[in-house]
Every structure is written in C-alpha cells, then in structure tokens.
C-alpha cells in the first residue's frame, strides 16, 4: 500500500491523485498515443494498447474533473473561466494555425478540411468535449456540493438514455461529436464527485473494488472484437470504478520508474499532455503517408512519430509561454 514520502501514515486516494496528477496524466497521454499508433500492430504489446489504450481518455477526464473542483474552490467563477480560456484557446489556435500552414505545404490533416474546425482544433472530439465540460463544470459543482450522490446518478442515467438516441451527421458538424461527449461526461463528473466527497476507503480496498470492473471492461472489449456482442449503452459506466484502479496502477508504475530513475518521463508527458493530444495524430499520419518517410521501417516511423510529437508539443508550449508573458491577457 502506498505511503507518504515524509512519514509512515497511509496515503489516501485523494492525496494520491492530488500529488500525482501530472504523472497520472502522463500515463493517460502515453496510453492515448499508443492507442492511436498503427505502425507496429504485429507486436502483441502494441495490439494490447490498441485494444485498451483508449482508457487513457477516461483516466485523463477523471483527473481533469478532480482538478477542476480545486480550481473552482480557489477562484471565483469568472476567474475560473478566464484561467480555462488562457490554457485552452491560445494553445489550440497556435497548434491549429501551424497545422493549417503545414497542410498548405503538403502535410495533410485527414480528419477535416474545414478551416475553422482545423484552426480551433474542435474537429478533435476530445477538445470539443473538454470545452463543453469546462463550460458546464461550475453548474455541476453547484449541484454536487448539495446533492452529490443524486447529481452523479442523474448524470449517469441521462448519459445511458442519451446513448440510445442515434446521432449521425457530417464529421465537420459539432453535433457529430455529441455521442462521444455524452458517453464520457459521467467519468468527468465522477472525478469532480471524488474531489467534493473524498473516498474514505483505503487505497488497497479501492484497488480491489475497482479491479473486477476493469477486468469486465477488458472482457467486453475482447468479446466485441470477436464479434460476439453489441455495444452496451452502460459500458462506459463500468469505467468509473475501473478508473480508480487505473490510477493506483499508474501510481505503482510511477514508483517503478522512480526506482530506475526514469520518473521524469511520465511527468514530461503529463506536463505537455494538451499539446501532445493536439499534435500526435497529425504527426503519426503524415510520417506514415508522406513520401519523404516512405522508406523507413514501421518501428522507426513509430519512434520518429513519438519524438516529433514530443518536440512539437514542447515548442508549442514554449511559444505560448513566451507570447503570454508579453501579452496583456497573460499578465
């Protein structure tokens, strides 16, 4: 069972998340990047992450919801919105403008050719989702403080019911992404719930309570891949308790990396998680398809894709930090 670094007292689950949000987000971002890679599908470890790596999104949203509550506690609602806007808008627009320029130079963004969607990065469902979640978070927080369990239950029930409504639209229309947003809303609200009502069970107990749900989620994905069952409307709800176990596994992974003096790798991925999300798929696809890289082997393309994604993420943050320091809105 994890313990605090400075004493022998047992680390609570909320302390584990509060102290480890950066490296846990790093775990989530690595899972997302492995899920989206398609360079080395013949290797079992790569195939595993293509099956299960999408849970990185769930882990990321749980941590985001948890962090949003602390932001709302410290700031007025107005300042909260200002802080969210400063974090999202400049980064998304700078990355979008760079993608547009690269697109005009022959590096293609295959997911959209709509200039507005490309520049704002709203064509990426996750960016659209966090914009929606951050917008409604103060209202959800208001209800969670008063009716915590009831609010979470209502959100979960409405999410399941809304999944029964078919939504079909052109990918360039934002309505086409509402299904993704609706499905992941409960995990975001669950993160907020944990911050409002800290879990009182031990970390060990939480791990074992969430493990069956994680294993069941894995089994359902395997069955779906084998073609033995249809998508269940409540499947994403299984990931609420499962995500708690994933947080603890991420913490143990971090401790392993710390033991071999490599823990800063997770912190780097976590620190630049937004920028990495904005860039990695664009870079993956162009490295795989561009004629300049056609003679490279697939493993080399994968390593190059990750390295270039990290470089672009770092440069994007560096540019934003420079511009914000010299801009009136950044002061």
Locations of regions flagged by a protein language model:
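Alpha-helical transmembrane segments and terminal signal-anchor/GPI-anchor hydrophobic tails
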Residues: 9, 178-185, 199-275, 282-287, ...
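Histidine-centered divalent metal-coordination motifs
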Residues: 36, 277-280
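Loop-centered beta-sheet repeat module
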Residues: 151-197
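Specific aromatic-rich, kink-prone transmembrane helix
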Residues: 135, 139, 189, 193, ...
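Membrane-cytosol interface segments of multi-pass membrane proteins
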Residues: 1-162, 204-206, 260, 267-272, ...
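Long, hydrophilic "mature protein body" segments
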Residues: 12, 36, 73-75, 141-145, ...
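Membrane-interface helix caps and helix-loop-helix hairpins in membrane proteins
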Residues: 42-48, 115-120, 167-178, 224-234
């Amino acid at each position: 069972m994890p313990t605090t670094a400075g004493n022998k007292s047992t680390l609570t689950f909320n302390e584990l998340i509060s102290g480890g949000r950066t490296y846990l987000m790093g775990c989530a971002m690595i899972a997302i990047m492995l899920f989206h890679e398609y360079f080395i599908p013949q290797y079992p470890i790569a195939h595993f992450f293509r099956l299960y790596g999408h849970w990185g999104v769930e882990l990321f949203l749980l941590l985001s919801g948890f962090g949003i509550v602390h932001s709302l506690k410290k700031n007025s609602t107005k300042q909260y919105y200002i802080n969210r806007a400063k974090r999202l808008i400049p980064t998304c627009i700078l990355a979008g403008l760079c993608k547009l320029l690269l697109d005009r130079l022959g590096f293609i963004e295959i997911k959209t050719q709509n200039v507005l969607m490309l520049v704002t990065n709203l064509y990426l469902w996750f960016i659209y989702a966090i914009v929606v979640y951050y917008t409604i978070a103060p209202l959800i927080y208001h209800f969670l403080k008063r009716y915590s369990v009831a609010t979470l239950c209502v959100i979960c029930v409405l999410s399941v019911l809304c999944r029964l409504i078919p939504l079909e639209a052109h990918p360039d229309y934002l309505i086409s992404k509402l299904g993704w947003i609706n499905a992941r809303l409960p995990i975001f609200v669950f993160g907020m719930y944990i911050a409002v009502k800290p879990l009182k069970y031990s970390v060990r107990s939480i791990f074992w309570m969430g493990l069956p749900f994680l294993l069941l989620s894995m089994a359902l994905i395997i069955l779906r891949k084998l073609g033995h069952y249809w998508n269940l409307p409540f499947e994403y709800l299984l990931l609420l308790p499962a995500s708690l176990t994933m947080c603890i596994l991420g913490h143990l992974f971090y401790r392993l990396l710390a033991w071999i003096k490599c823990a800063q790798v997770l912190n780097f991925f976590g620190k630049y998680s937004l920028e990495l999300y904005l860039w990695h798929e664009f870079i993956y696809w162009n490295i795989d398809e561009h004629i300049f890289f056609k003679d490279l082997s697939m493993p080399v393309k994968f390593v190059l894709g990750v390295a270039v994604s990290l470089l672009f993420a770092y440069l994007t943050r560096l540019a934003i930090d420079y511009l914000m320091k010299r801009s009136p809105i950044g002061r």
